[in-house]
């Protein structure tokens, strides 16, 4: 999943401003509408997926738990799209060895339902790490990582 935005290493992260915990919700999407199949789409208020992210003392990215997936999603941080994209972003920021995070993923929509569950989880994870770091990145800078996770 290489995105490699080397310009992100120029971003200054204020380690004193890093939060201990954040929670982000990302809604389901509908993109298969009549003649606008995969062209027209919209987000809905519910359902959606939720990510809780915690700063921990040991560096690295780990999955603490996944709820609502029926045991189908990997807890291995290298094989889960949420944690893999967070890890990639931290590498590109040049701080992957300086920070540790644990992720709780709460799935509120069925996997394979066509509601954009994997996209919602990935976006929530990336917005969560950005919020944890004090929001140093713009939405445009986060976008390549969101696309990579999808």
PLM ranges: what are they?
Residues 115-138:
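DPxDG-like acidic metal-binding loop motif
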Residues 2-113, 131, 135:
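ATP-binding N-lobe of GHMP and related small-molecule kinases
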Residues 78-81, 121, 138-141:
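Short acidic-hydrophobic sequence patches enriched in Asp/Glu that either
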Residues 137-150:
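Alpha/beta catalytic cores of group-transfer enzymes, especially the acyltransferase/condensing modules
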Residues 86, 126, 143:
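Generic structural marker for isolated residues within well-ordered, non-membrane alpha-helices
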